[in-house]
Protein backbone atom coordinates (compact mmCIF):
# COMPACT_ATOMS: atom_id res chain seq x y z
CA UNK A 1 0.00 0.00 0.00
CA UNK A 2 1.50 3.34 -1.06
CA UNK A 3 2.00 6.06 1.54
CA UNK A 4 0.20 9.37 1.39
CA UNK A 5 2.14 12.57 0.93
CA UNK A 6 3.35 13.75 4.36
CA UNK A 7 2.19 17.32 3.75
CA UNK A 8 -1.23 15.99 2.79
CA UNK A 9 -1.32 13.86 5.95
CA UNK A 10 -0.83 16.93 8.15
CA UNK A 11 -2.92 19.19 5.96
CA UNK A 12 -0.19 21.80 5.47
CA UNK A 13 1.45 23.37 2.44
CA UNK A 14 4.91 22.37 1.22
CA UNK A 15 6.38 25.68 2.43
CA UNK A 16 4.85 25.39 5.91
CA UNK A 17 7.19 26.40 8.72
CA UNK A 18 7.91 24.47 11.93
CA UNK A 19 5.17 26.25 13.87
CA UNK A 20 2.47 25.38 11.32
CA UNK A 21 3.60 21.75 11.19
CA UNK A 22 3.63 21.45 14.97
CA UNK A 23 0.19 23.02 15.25
CA UNK A 24 -1.26 20.61 12.68
CA UNK A 25 0.41 17.66 14.41
CA UNK A 26 -1.03 18.58 17.81
CA UNK A 27 -4.53 18.85 16.42
CA UNK A 28 -4.43 15.54 14.53
CA UNK A 29 -2.53 13.64 17.23
CA UNK A 30 -5.13 14.60 19.82
CA UNK A 31 -7.91 13.58 17.45
CA UNK A 32 -6.53 10.14 16.62
CA UNK A 33 -4.54 9.22 19.76
CA UNK A 34 -5.26 5.59 20.85
CA UNK A 35 -6.08 6.70 24.41
CA UNK A 36 -9.03 8.65 23.03
CA UNK A 37 -10.05 6.03 20.47
CA UNK A 38 -9.66 2.73 22.30
CA UNK A 39 -10.45 -0.25 20.10
CA UNK A 40 -10.48 1.85 16.92
CA UNK A 41 -7.81 0.33 14.66
CA UNK A 42 -8.42 2.95 11.97
CA UNK A 43 -7.69 5.79 14.38
CA UNK A 44 -4.53 4.06 15.55
CA UNK A 45 -3.25 3.77 11.95
CA UNK A 46 -4.01 7.44 11.32
CA UNK A 47 -2.14 8.37 14.50
CA UNK A 48 0.93 6.42 13.32
CA UNK A 49 0.70 8.09 9.91
CA UNK A 50 0.48 11.56 11.47
CA UNK A 51 3.39 10.82 13.83
CA UNK A 52 5.62 9.60 10.98
CA UNK A 53 4.84 12.68 8.89
CA UNK A 54 5.66 14.95 11.83
CA UNK A 55 8.98 13.21 12.53
CA UNK A 56 10.14 13.62 8.94
CA UNK A 57 8.96 17.19 8.37
CA UNK A 58 10.48 18.52 11.62
CA UNK A 59 13.92 17.08 10.87
CA UNK A 60 15.62 19.58 8.56
CA UNK A 61 17.82 16.97 6.85
CA UNK A 62 15.08 14.37 6.38
CA UNK A 63 12.62 16.99 5.17
CA UNK A 64 15.07 18.18 2.50
CA UNK A 65 15.56 14.59 1.30
CA UNK A 66 11.83 13.94 1.31
CA UNK A 67 11.19 17.10 -0.72
CA UNK A 68 13.76 15.94 -3.29
CA UNK A 69 13.18 12.18 -3.46
CA UNK A 70 9.80 11.54 -1.83
CA UNK A 71 9.27 8.53 0.44
CA UNK A 72 12.21 6.67 -1.11
CA UNK A 73 14.58 9.31 0.24
CA UNK A 74 13.62 8.81 3.90
CA UNK A 75 12.38 5.23 4.31
CA UNK A 76 15.93 3.81 4.59
CA UNK A 77 17.08 6.54 6.95
CA UNK A 78 14.35 5.79 9.43
CA UNK A 79 15.21 2.10 9.62
CA UNK A 80 13.53 0.25 12.45
CA UNK A 81 14.50 2.55 15.28
CA UNK A 82 13.19 5.91 14.15
CA UNK A 83 15.33 8.73 15.48
CA UNK A 84 16.98 7.01 18.39
CA UNK A 85 17.90 9.49 21.13
CA UNK A 86 15.45 12.11 19.90
CA UNK A 87 12.43 9.94 20.58
CA UNK A 88 9.66 10.05 18.04
CA UNK A 89 8.60 13.63 18.19
CA UNK A 90 6.33 15.05 20.90
CA UNK A 91 4.42 12.52 22.96
CA UNK A 92 0.80 12.87 24.02
CA UNK A 93 1.80 14.48 27.30
CA UNK A 94 3.69 17.18 25.39
CA UNK A 95 0.62 17.85 23.27
CA UNK A 96 -1.73 18.23 26.24
CA UNK A 97 0.87 20.30 28.06
CA UNK A 98 0.97 22.83 25.21
CA UNK A 99 -2.78 22.88 24.73
CA UNK A 100 -3.61 23.28 28.43
CA UNK A 101 -0.89 25.90 28.60
CA UNK A 102 -2.86 27.91 26.03
CA UNK A 103 -6.13 27.41 27.90
CA UNK A 104 -4.93 28.05 31.44
CA UNK A 105 -2.36 30.68 30.71
CA UNK A 106 0.82 28.69 30.30
CA UNK A 107 2.50 29.67 33.55
CA UNK A 108 -0.44 28.32 35.59
CA UNK A 109 0.05 31.23 37.92
CA UNK A 110 -2.10 33.68 36.01
CA UNK A 111 0.81 35.93 35.09
CA UNK A 112 1.70 37.17 31.66
CA UNK A 113 2.86 34.47 29.34
CA UNK A 114 5.19 36.52 27.16
CA UNK A 115 6.70 35.72 23.76
CA UNK A 116 7.42 32.03 23.27
CA UNK A 117 10.97 30.70 22.98
CA UNK A 118 11.75 29.35 19.52
CA UNK A 119 11.24 25.68 18.70
CA UNK A 120 14.10 23.21 18.86
CA UNK A 121 15.20 21.67 15.56
CA UNK A 122 16.58 18.24 14.69
CA UNK A 123 19.08 17.29 12.02
CA UNK A 124 20.23 13.75 11.22
CA UNK A 125 23.90 13.57 10.19
CA UNK A 126 25.23 10.45 8.48
CA UNK A 127 28.86 9.56 9.20
CA UNK A 128 31.22 6.86 8.02
CA UNK A 129 32.68 4.62 10.72
CA UNK A 130 36.07 6.28 10.21
CA UNK A 131 34.55 9.75 10.76
CA UNK A 132 32.71 8.59 13.87
CA UNK A 133 35.82 6.99 15.36
CA UNK A 134 38.25 9.83 14.59
CA UNK A 135 35.93 12.84 14.83
CA UNK A 136 35.16 15.29 12.06
CA UNK A 137 33.96 18.82 11.35
CA UNK A 138 31.16 19.18 8.81
CA UNK A 139 29.08 21.97 7.38
CA UNK A 140 25.32 21.52 7.32
CA UNK A 141 22.50 23.57 5.81
CA UNK A 142 19.46 24.01 8.05
CA UNK A 143 16.19 25.69 6.95
CA UNK A 144 14.92 27.63 9.96
CA UNK A 145 13.28 30.82 11.20
CA UNK A 146 15.68 33.66 12.04
CA UNK A 147 15.08 37.00 13.75
CA UNK A 148 14.43 39.80 11.29
CA UNK A 149 17.47 42.08 11.28
CA UNK A 150 15.47 45.02 9.90
CA UNK A 151 13.05 45.30 12.83
CA UNK A 152 15.23 43.44 15.37
CA UNK A 153 12.50 40.87 15.81
CA UNK A 154 9.80 43.33 16.87
CA UNK A 155 7.73 42.93 13.69
CA UNK A 156 7.15 46.70 13.48
CA UNK A 157 8.20 48.90 10.56
CA UNK A 158 11.21 51.17 11.08
CA UNK A 159 10.13 54.32 12.93
CA UNK A 160 7.01 52.71 14.40
CA UNK A 161 6.45 50.48 17.40
CA UNK A 162 4.06 47.79 18.57
CA UNK A 163 1.02 49.01 20.51
CA UNK A 164 -0.45 47.49 23.67
CA UNK A 165 -3.31 45.15 22.78
CA UNK A 166 -6.64 46.84 23.75
CA UNK A 167 -8.32 43.46 24.31
CA UNK A 168 -5.94 41.91 26.88
CA UNK A 169 -4.24 45.19 27.91
CA UNK A 170 -0.82 43.73 27.28
CA UNK A 171 -1.19 40.53 29.31
CA UNK A 172 -1.51 38.28 26.26
CA UNK A 173 -4.39 36.46 27.96
CA UNK A 174 -8.13 36.81 28.29
CA UNK A 175 -10.45 35.21 30.84
CA UNK A 176 -13.48 33.26 29.73
CA UNK A 177 -16.26 31.60 31.70
CA UNK A 178 -17.28 28.04 30.93
CA UNK A 179 -20.10 27.05 33.25
CA UNK A 180 -18.84 27.34 36.82
CA UNK A 181 -15.23 27.71 35.75
CA UNK A 182 -13.25 30.79 34.79
CA UNK A 183 -10.32 29.89 32.55
CA UNK A 184 -7.63 31.85 30.76
CA UNK A 185 -6.57 31.47 27.17
CA UNK A 186 -4.33 33.24 24.71
CA UNK A 187 -5.80 36.50 23.53
CA UNK A 188 -7.36 35.94 20.10
CA UNK A 189 -6.65 39.55 19.09
CA UNK A 190 -2.87 39.59 19.61
CA UNK A 191 -2.36 35.80 19.67
CA UNK A 192 -0.85 35.94 23.15
CA UNK A 193 1.79 38.56 22.39
CA UNK A 194 0.19 41.41 24.29
CA UNK A 195 1.11 43.77 21.44
CA UNK A 196 -0.57 44.82 18.20
CA UNK A 197 1.49 45.79 15.17
CA UNK A 198 -0.34 48.36 13.07
CA UNK A 199 2.54 49.14 10.70
CA UNK A 200 4.30 45.82 10.03
CA UNK A 201 7.91 45.43 8.94
CA UNK A 202 8.21 45.13 5.16
CA UNK A 203 10.74 42.28 5.32
CA UNK A 204 9.09 39.92 7.82
CA UNK A 205 5.49 41.18 7.37
CA UNK A 206 5.05 41.73 11.09
CA UNK A 207 6.20 38.28 12.19
CA UNK A 208 9.54 39.43 13.62
CA UNK A 209 11.26 36.48 11.92
CA UNK A 210 11.48 34.89 8.51
CA UNK A 211 12.53 31.65 6.81
CA UNK A 212 16.21 31.26 5.95
CA UNK A 213 18.65 28.42 5.30
CA UNK A 214 21.63 28.73 7.65
CA UNK A 215 25.03 27.14 7.05
CA UNK A 216 26.55 25.85 10.28
CA UNK A 217 29.83 24.14 11.11
CA UNK A 218 29.37 21.14 13.40
CA UNK A 219 32.31 19.58 15.25
CA UNK A 220 31.70 15.88 15.87
CA UNK A 221 33.87 14.49 18.70
CA UNK A 222 35.81 11.25 18.23
CA UNK A 223 34.06 8.09 19.38
CA UNK A 224 30.41 8.98 18.72
CA UNK A 225 27.96 6.27 17.73
CA UNK A 226 24.50 5.99 16.20
CA UNK A 227 21.95 7.63 18.51
CA UNK A 228 24.37 10.17 20.02
CA UNK A 229 23.39 13.79 19.59
CA UNK A 230 25.16 17.12 19.71
CA UNK A 231 23.33 20.23 20.90
CA UNK A 232 24.00 23.56 19.23
CA UNK A 233 22.59 26.09 21.68
CA UNK A 234 20.57 28.92 20.14
CA UNK A 235 20.72 27.52 16.61
CA UNK A 236 17.08 26.43 16.51
CA UNK A 237 14.13 28.56 15.42
CA UNK A 238 14.05 32.21 16.45
CA UNK A 239 11.46 32.96 19.14
CA UNK A 240 8.41 35.16 18.71
CA UNK A 241 8.72 38.92 19.13
CA UNK A 242 12.46 38.77 19.76
CA UNK A 243 12.30 35.87 22.23
CA UNK A 244 15.35 33.57 22.46
CA UNK A 245 15.93 30.95 19.78
CA UNK A 246 15.59 27.25 20.42
CA UNK A 247 18.40 24.73 20.10
CA UNK A 248 19.51 22.54 17.21
CA UNK A 249 20.08 18.85 17.96
CA UNK A 250 22.33 17.02 15.52
CA UNK A 251 21.70 13.28 15.75
CA UNK A 252 24.41 10.89 14.60
CA UNK A 253 23.73 7.94 12.29
CA UNK A 254 26.80 5.82 11.47
CA UNK A 255 26.62 4.00 8.13
CA UNK A 256 27.41 0.30 7.83
CA UNK A 257 31.07 -0.53 7.16
CA UNK A 258 32.17 -3.09 4.56
CA UNK A 259 34.65 -4.77 6.95
CA UNK A 260 33.93 -3.85 10.57
CA UNK A 261 30.88 -4.17 12.80
CA UNK A 262 30.82 -1.96 15.88
CA UNK A 263 29.43 -3.04 19.25
CA UNK A 264 30.00 -0.38 21.87
CA UNK A 265 33.72 0.38 21.81
CA UNK A 266 34.69 -2.97 20.28
CA UNK A 267 35.06 -3.70 16.58
CA UNK A 268 34.42 -7.09 14.98
CA UNK A 269 35.59 -8.47 11.64
CA UNK A 270 35.94 -11.79 9.83
CA UNK A 271 39.40 -12.77 8.57
CA UNK A 272 39.76 -15.52 5.92
CA UNK A 273 42.84 -17.75 6.29
CA UNK A 274 44.12 -20.70 4.26
CA UNK A 275 43.58 -24.20 5.63
CA UNK A 276 47.37 -24.57 5.69
CA UNK A 277 47.78 -21.52 7.95
CA UNK A 278 44.92 -22.80 10.10
CA UNK A 279 46.57 -26.21 10.50
CA UNK A 280 50.19 -25.13 10.91
CA UNK A 281 49.78 -21.66 12.40
CA UNK A 282 51.71 -18.56 11.41
CA UNK A 283 51.36 -14.81 10.99
CA UNK A 284 48.65 -13.18 8.89
CA UNK A 285 47.77 -9.57 8.10
CA UNK A 286 44.50 -8.19 9.43
CA UNK A 287 42.90 -4.78 8.79
CA UNK A 288 42.41 -2.14 11.48
CA UNK A 289 41.19 1.44 11.25
CA UNK A 290 44.85 2.50 11.49
CA UNK A 291 46.14 0.18 8.77
CA UNK A 292 47.24 -3.45 8.51
CA UNK A 293 48.83 -5.25 11.46
CA UNK A 294 50.25 -8.74 12.04
CA UNK A 295 48.22 -11.37 13.89
CA UNK A 296 49.75 -14.62 15.13
CA UNK A 297 47.50 -17.60 14.40
CA UNK A 298 48.03 -20.63 16.62
CA UNK A 299 48.35 -24.10 15.04
CA UNK A 300 45.19 -26.23 14.63
CA UNK A 301 42.93 -23.15 14.51
CA UNK A 302 39.30 -23.90 13.62
CA UNK A 303 36.75 -21.73 11.79
CA UNK A 304 34.98 -19.43 14.23
CA UNK A 305 37.88 -18.98 16.63
CA UNK A 306 38.08 -15.40 17.91
CA UNK A 307 41.35 -13.52 18.32
CA UNK A 308 41.40 -10.34 20.43
CA UNK A 309 43.63 -7.41 19.46
CA UNK A 310 43.65 -5.14 22.49
CA UNK A 311 43.44 -1.39 22.01
CA UNK A 312 42.54 -1.63 18.33
CA UNK A 313 38.88 -0.71 18.81
CA UNK A 314 37.16 2.65 19.42
CA UNK A 315 38.08 5.25 22.04
CA UNK A 316 35.01 6.03 24.15
CA UNK A 317 33.73 9.59 23.74
CA UNK A 318 32.73 9.57 27.44
CA UNK A 319 35.31 7.56 29.42
CA UNK A 320 38.30 7.74 27.08
CA UNK A 321 38.80 3.97 27.32
CA UNK A 322 39.75 2.17 24.10
CA UNK A 323 37.96 -0.99 22.98
CA UNK A 324 39.38 -4.04 21.23
CA UNK A 325 39.30 -5.51 17.74
CA UNK A 326 37.82 -9.02 17.67
CA UNK A 327 38.93 -11.05 14.64
CA UNK A 328 36.87 -14.13 13.80
CA UNK A 329 38.80 -16.64 11.71
CA UNK A 330 37.15 -18.26 8.69
CA UNK A 331 39.13 -21.14 7.19
CA UNK A 332 38.94 -20.84 3.41
CA UNK A 333 38.41 -23.93 1.24
CA UNK A 334 40.65 -23.84 -1.87
CA UNK A 335 38.86 -23.70 -5.23
CA UNK A 336 39.76 -24.39 -8.89
CA UNK A 337 42.30 -27.07 -8.00
CA UNK A 338 44.49 -28.78 -10.60
CA UNK A 339 44.50 -32.59 -10.85
CA UNK A 340 47.87 -32.80 -9.14
CA UNK A 341 46.62 -30.66 -6.26
CA UNK A 342 43.51 -32.81 -5.91
CA UNK A 343 45.68 -35.94 -5.80
CA UNK A 344 47.81 -34.46 -3.04
CA UNK A 345 44.68 -33.71 -1.02
CA UNK A 346 43.41 -37.27 -1.51
CA UNK A 347 46.73 -38.64 -0.26
CA UNK A 348 46.57 -36.32 2.74
CA UNK A 349 43.02 -37.41 3.53
CA UNK A 350 43.98 -41.09 3.29
CA UNK A 351 46.74 -40.48 5.81
CA UNK A 352 44.05 -39.35 8.26
CA UNK A 353 42.03 -42.57 8.00
CA UNK A 354 42.04 -45.58 10.28
CA UNK A 355 43.47 -45.32 13.76
CA UNK A 356 44.87 -41.85 13.06
CA UNK A 357 41.40 -40.38 12.42
CA UNK A 358 40.64 -39.70 16.08
CA UNK A 359 43.91 -37.82 16.41
CA UNK A 360 43.73 -35.75 13.24
CA UNK A 361 39.94 -35.29 12.86
CA UNK A 362 38.50 -35.46 16.40
CA UNK A 363 35.33 -33.50 15.63
CA UNK A 364 34.44 -35.49 12.51
CA UNK A 365 35.05 -38.84 14.21
CA UNK A 366 33.12 -37.74 17.27
CA UNK A 367 30.20 -36.62 15.12
CA UNK A 368 29.96 -39.86 13.14
CA UNK A 369 30.29 -41.98 16.27
CA UNK A 370 27.39 -40.02 17.75
CA UNK A 371 25.29 -40.61 14.62
CA UNK A 372 26.05 -44.35 14.78
CA UNK A 373 24.98 -44.54 18.43
CA UNK A 374 21.78 -42.64 17.61
CA UNK A 375 20.70 -45.13 14.93
CA UNK A 376 21.80 -48.11 17.05
CA UNK A 377 19.50 -46.88 19.81
CA UNK A 378 16.60 -46.54 17.34
CA UNK A 379 16.94 -50.12 16.11
CA UNK A 380 17.65 -51.79 19.47
Curated annotation (Swiss-Prot):
It comes from the Bacteria. Its main location: cytoplasm. One of its GO terms (cellular component) is cytoplasm. Zn(2+) 1 binds at residues 148, 151, 201, 204. One of its GO terms (biological process) is chaperone cofactor-dependent protein refolding. Its cofactor is Zn(2+). Binds 2 Zn(2+) ions per monomer. CDD domains: DnaJ, DnaJ_C, DnaJ_zf. It is found in: Cytoplasm. Pfam families: DnaJ, DnaJ_C, DnaJ_CXXCXGXG. The keyword Transcription does not apply. Zn(2+) 2 binds at residues 165, 168, 187, 190. SUPFAM superfamilies: Chaperone J-domain, DnaJ/Hsp40 cysteine-rich domain, HSP40/DnaJ peptide-binding domain. Coiled coil: none annotated. Gene3D superfamilies: DnaJ domain, Heat shock protein DnaJ, cysteine-rich domain, Urease metallochaperone UreE, N-terminal domain. Residues 5-70 form the J domain. CXXCXGXG motif repeats lie at residues 148-155, 165-172, 187-194, 201-208. GO terms for molecular function: ATP binding; heat shock protein binding; unfolded protein binding; zinc ion binding. The J domain is necessary and sufficient to stimulate DnaK ATPase activity. Zinc center 1 plays an important role in the autonomous, DnaK-independent chaperone activity of DnaJ. Zinc center 2 is essential for interaction with DnaK and for DnaJ activity. Homodimer. Participates actively in the response to hyperosmotic and heat shock by preventing the aggregation of stress-denatured proteins and by disaggregating proteins, also in an autonomous, DnaK-independent fashion. Unfolded proteins bind initially to DnaJ; upon interaction with the DnaJ-bound protein, DnaK hydrolyzes its bound ATP, resulting in the formation of a stable complex. GrpE releases ADP from DnaK; ATP binding to DnaK triggers the release of the substrate protein, thus completing the reaction cycle. PANTHER family: CHAPERONE PROTEIN DNAJ, DNAJ HOMOLOG 1, MITOCHONDRIAL-RELATED. Belongs to the DnaJ family. This is Chaperone protein DnaJ.
